[in-house]
Amino acid sequence: MLRSLAALLLLSTTALADTADGEALKAMTWDQIEAEAKGGTVNWFMWGGSDTINAYVSDYVAGRLKAEYDITLNRVPITDAAEIVNLILTEKEAGITDAGTVDLIWINGENFRSMQQGDLAFCGYTGLLPNDALVNWQNPAIANDFGVPVEGCEVPWNTVQFAFAHDSAKTPEPPLDMADLIAWIKANPGRFTYPAPPDFTGSAFLRHVFIHAAGGPERLLGPFDQATFNEVSAKTWALLNEIEPFLWREGATYPATVTQLNELFANGEVAFSFNYDPAQFGLAVQAGTWPETTRSYGLTDGTIGNTNYTLIPFNSPNKAAAMVVQNLLLSGEAQLEKAKTEVWGAAPAIEISRTAPEVQAGFAAIITHPSVVPAADLAKAALPELQADWLTAIEKGWAENVGN
């Protein structure tokens, strides 16, 4: 880890920095910010587990930034955003206030909460982005990140909702709610597993079980409550320990990442995969790694949906260029490009009705891949995200009571 951090710190010294600090940028016009950003480099730290997402960023986004703004985008792949949050915190504690390693991070949830608590985010500027007008900030699912108000500290990039994938040729009648899934696991030993938390997707599956054990999300909304957690978590650990002997490899080990789960599904070792981003299912079929008979669905008792964002750290030396990147990502054209089935299939974080007519027409022409459950179908049974303190407690409790 120390070696990797040293490499990242070296990377930061090679980037050209903006000359204006954050407060000076807030007093500029957008034209002045673009001029300040010209010739800059943005080190964007983001999850790197999807070749299609990586290609969209490295080819389409980076290509447009270079051609239109002379900005170099350096995509830095990571597996866990928490490590980068800790890096930024370490820099702050070391007094590195204007020459940080990270210019932009793909983030949400408990990692955003940590950035807020540590005063690690650059805030109060998002209204300067011209394409901020495309965002519906009246939507609480966008204005709040896992229950934490965004308050001008991050910019939405995608909206997602959890879904399950199965091979319809092998599992034509999948379990449609959590109770049925638990029964199915017991009746089909070795055919199900989930990534071990704190893997992002594994943690999400765990929260679905937690919500099921609570009898629904109503008691879990709002700030963390220890008494409620104690009651619901006891039921959750009992359920998970009850099904553990029926999991893949009898629960002796868990996939470390969703990528490993996807490989197990591709190899036919397990009957299900799942993801916050169902578009990944269609891309896996198109790539030939998953069967053509892959189909996906949400649970009738609901699946969790959320928004993910990009954030500029307080000590980024390239804030103007990072703001230009965020504005491009919000544009109707860039949101349309990533929504295309053959590119990514990601759901937009903007109001399509606010975009240009040709962009609206482009969205209307998109045909959802047959392996991807339509977002409108998932939205009929959407569950809210829990606030970040719940996530931390659930993950810690799983490690102590199930994964030990």
Q: Across the structure, where does each feature detected by a protein language model lie?
A:
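Gram-negative bacterial Sec-dependent N-terminal signal peptides
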Residues: 1-17
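Conserved C-terminal helix/tail region of periplasmic/extracytoplasmic solute-binding proteins
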Residues: 18-30, 263, 369-404
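Early extracytoplasmic/lumenal segment of secretory-pathway proteins
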Residues: 22-110
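Loop/turn elements at helix/coil->beta-strand transitions in domains of secreted/extracellular proteins
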Residues: 39-43, 69-72, 99-103, 188-192, ...
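Extracytoplasmic ligand-binding site segments that recognize negatively charged/polar headgroups
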Residues: 47-60, 75-85, 102-259
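Paired acidic/hydrophobic, glycine-rich loop segments that form the ligand-binding mouth/hinge
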Residues: 96-106, 124, 271-276, 282
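Extracytoplasmic/periplasmic substrate-binding proteins
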Residues: 208, 248-315
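Mature extracytoplasmic/periplasmic domains
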Residues: 303, 308-377
